[in-house]
Amino acid sequence: MTLRRGSCPLLLFSLVGLLTTCAQEPDAAGQNTTAVAEKAGTCPQAELEMPDRNCTEACQSDAGCEENKKCCRTGCGTSCQIPDEKPGSCPNVDTPIPPLGLCKTTCSKDSDCSETKKCCKNGCGFMTCTTARP
């Protein structure tokens, strides 16, 4: 192959255009390959048996969801959902005597708790909504 004079800039511009196009191509999941910050928490488990299945692709990534909601699979689509697990960790429960009035289960997962509270062990074998440690 012989290159004619003046053809190198054309070749260079073609390569730059190709690299720019490849960098913006969506990946196999249909999301852009540029990194988008993922929000904290884990998506609720998608229900496999749903009578009226919602197959709508309501979001592409967590960035498309408001507040602390995450873009989660719904069985055959996606939707913005409140995550099961919230950021932070449960406080240590080291009391030899369990706190009065808290010996009952009030939650089973973080999404059962309001705002930033987490579902944690309460010292007497049950789970309750507690303020999380950072």
Curated annotation (Swiss-Prot):
Q: What is its main location?
A: secreted
Signal peptide positions are 1-23
Mind telling me which SUPFAM superfamilies this protein's record contains?
Elafin-like
Q: In which tissues is it expressed?
A: Expressed by the venom gland.
- Stretches that traverse the bilayer: none
Q: Which cellular component terms (GO) are annotated to the entry?
A: extracellular region; extracellular space
**Keyword annotations from UniProtKB, A to Z:** Antibiotic, Antimicrobial, Disulfide bond, Repeat, Secreted, Signal
What is the top-level taxon of the source organism? Eukaryota
Disulfide-bonded cysteine pairs: these are: 43-72, 55-76, 59-71, 65-80, 90-120, 103-124, 107-119, 113-129
**Annotated coiled-coil segments of the chain:** none
Q: Subcellular location, in the record's words?
A: Secreted
Identify the InterPro entries for this entry.
Elafin-like_sf (IPR036645), WAP_dom (IPR008197), WAP_four-disulfide_core (IPR050514)
The WAP domain, residue ranges: 36-82, 83-133
* PANTHER family linked: WAP FOUR-DISULFIDE CORE DOMAIN PROTEIN 2, WHEY ACDIC PROTEIN WAP
The Swiss-Prot or TrEMBL record describes its family as follows: Belongs to the venom waprin family.
Function of the molecule? Damages membranes of susceptible bacteria. Has no hemolytic activity. Not toxic to mice. Does not inhibit the proteinases elastase and cathepsin G.
The protein's name: Waprin-Phi1
Task: Give the originating organism.
Answer: Philodryas olfersii (Green snake)
Q: Give the lineage.
A: Eukaryota, Metazoa, Chordata, Craniata, Vertebrata
